[in-house]
Amino acid sequence: MTPDDAFYLEERYVRRPRSRRLLPLFYRAKRFIPRRTQMHLRRTMARRQRGRHEAQGRFPRWPIEPLLVHQREILLHQRLLRAEGRRIPLLGAWPRGHRFAWTLTHDVEGPKGLANVERLLEIERRHGVVSAWYFVAEDYAIDPAVLEVVRAAGCEVGLHGLHHNGQLFQSRTHFERQLPRIRRYLREWGAEGFRSPSTHRNAAWMPELGARYDSSFPDTHPFDAQPGGCCSILPYFLGDLVELPITLPQDHTLFELLQERDISLWQEKAGWIARHGGLITVLVHPDYAIEDERLDHYEQLLAFLCALKGGWHALPRDVARWWRVRAALETQLGDAPPDATALARAGAARWFAAERDGEIVIETEEHAHA
């Protein structure tokens, strides 16, 4: 991570002092406002925010912020100029020659979501896919049998905080008070992953959670109580913590706030990420995916993702483990060109960058020799 990258990956560009003071007030007031009124206010605000983003090109753009992708392409272009027309070997982003990766995640916010776990698992079984489930540890009773059902389906159990109240990062004292219990639940559940309630985040503190990876940073998200985004469609490190950005708009954002009627925006964004070799991270809440229409949206998305060629479907914990392996390989290689045989032993692959008709083209090893 370069200092320039960190400015975006850690959201240093976001001015947050005022919003941090207001977040606890927002969550306290929320309890006394009828849900219908809440949703009306949030939908009105989301429509206005969307309009301003589209009209003014506000940063980060939504649903696609291409800044770091473009920066990566500029660096590649400079290397290609120095190579004088020769293609450049690269360490591939994904194992075994896959061109992109995709992973499925669910935040279980309350009892309704807990009761809906099996319905979403059944949809996933039909498509032969697996997912990660993040549970709130102390807001609702969690039958250990539910965690076993998730694990038996080949899925992953993660932690979604202690309470879904937006207060984890309200102060350093409060954060430190919760750390021992957060770490205990991670150990007891055998969980490697954490996602902060309401995706509230603090890049400086999150490495202390005790998780192997976090998935709380959206790449771009102007519609929440903590707007912003890391602008990345690739994993990255916060200290020793692997960050897996949420790169598709949440189902709640699309269908609850913006009241979209189909999955075309999901498809557009997923296709763009795949073309640029990124990580497609899906977040669907079982608390909201209850009606047949919402379940059908999820089924359509799975069919679309399964049909994309060249993708690596994996659990988030496996993506995070791979990113550690890849980082170690990158350190070992230094400036040396990657050797295909050595990479293959580590499950990695070599990519090639070339410039054709003024555009940068990335090819996997097999396509480069085809």
Residue positions per predicted region:
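Short, solvent-exposed turn/loop segments enriched in Gly/Ser/Thr/Pro and often Arg
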Residues: 135-143, 192-202, 218-221
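Conserved beta-strand positions
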Residues: 159, 196, 282-284
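An active-site-proximal "capping" alpha-helix that borders the catalytic cofactor pocket
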Residues: 175-189
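Glycine-rich phosphate-binding "P-loop"
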Residues: 104-109, 157-173
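Metal-dependent catalytic neighborhoods of phosphoester/phosphodiester hydrolases
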Residues: 145-146, 169-176, 205-207
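Terminal accessory/targeting
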Residues: 1-134, 139-142, 187-188, 207-210, ...
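Acidic, His- and aromatic-enriched active-site or binding-groove loops in soluble protein domains
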Residues: 154-164, 211-227, 235-237
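Active-site-proximal binding-pocket segments
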Residues: 167, 186, 195-198, 202-205, ...
